[in-house]
Design a protein with these regions (language model features):
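Hydrophobic anchor at the start of a short beta-strand
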Residues: 42, 96-97
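An anion/phosphate-binding loop that grips the pyrophosphate of nucleotide cofactors and donors
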Residues: 65
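Short glycine-/small-residue-rich Rossmann-like dinucleotide-binding loops
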Residues: 22, 73-74
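Conserved BB-loop
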Residues: 30-60, 74-83, 120-125
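C-terminal interaction surface of TIR/SEFIR-family domains
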Residues: 1-37, 101-185
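Conserved TIR/SEFIR loop-to-helix hotspot centered on a Trp-containing motif
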Residues: 74-94, 104-108
Length: 185
């Protein structure tokens, strides 16, 4: 499985916390890569060391970040962790906005939370250039801008598509009764 080409930011300077659902990484990672390439200091959960206490690390980074971008999709709206990250960022009064990846039906509570700030509806832009131009208009993101990193290679969403046959040697992945696990048969 391909990893994001941008390393999570480590340091004390102002940075952007990215909230996203792992199921959406093929859409989110290319955006993170482009932003990092353009010099933005971004932290996302690939920066959690194995064996670490996940909620503490997330809360610490959300608390210390300057800004938060939440990537909104059906997947993220159905993720308890993504909703908690959004709620915590707003509770801590972080500079916040959302990037809506697809048309979604939000619960009234989430709609109320996200309506306080302007969202960017990525799926409405005809090109990545147009999208990034709009994204970078967010003035507070400029405070999280460091030196560009031209060595980062920006992926395409298809680079992150998982092929079951490549991963497991079979396309036959089934769910067993009374189990939330997936098994090969």
């Amino acid at each position: 499985m391909k990893r994001c080409g941008a390393k999570p930011y480590k340091g004390k300077e102002k940075n952007i916390f990215v909230s996203y659902c792992h199921k959406d990484k093929k859409y989110v990672f290319p955006i993170i890569e482009q932003m990092a390439k353009d010099g933005y200091r971004i932290w996302y959960d690939e920066g959690i060391d194995p064996g670490s206490e996940w909620p503490e690390i997330i809360a610490t980074h959300l608390n210390s970040c300057d800004s938060c971008i939440a990537f909104i999709s059906e997947n993220s709206l159905n993720s308890h962790n993504c909703r908690r990250e959004v709620n915590f960022a707003l509770l801590k009064k972080k500079r916040f906005f959302s990037v809506v990846l697809e048309e979604v039906q939000m619960s009234l509570g989430m709609e109320m939370q996200l309506s306080a700030t302007q969202s960017i509806f990525k799926y409405t832009y005809s090109s990545d250039k147009e999208f990034f131009t709009k994204l970078y208009e967010a003035k507070f993101l400029q405070e999280c801008l460091g030196d560009p990193n031209p060595d980062i290679i920006v992926s395409k969403p298809s680079d992150y598509t998982e092929n079951l046959k490549d991963l497991f040697g079979s396309d036959d992945l089934v769910r067993k009764p009374f189990s939330d696990k997936w098994f090969l048969e």
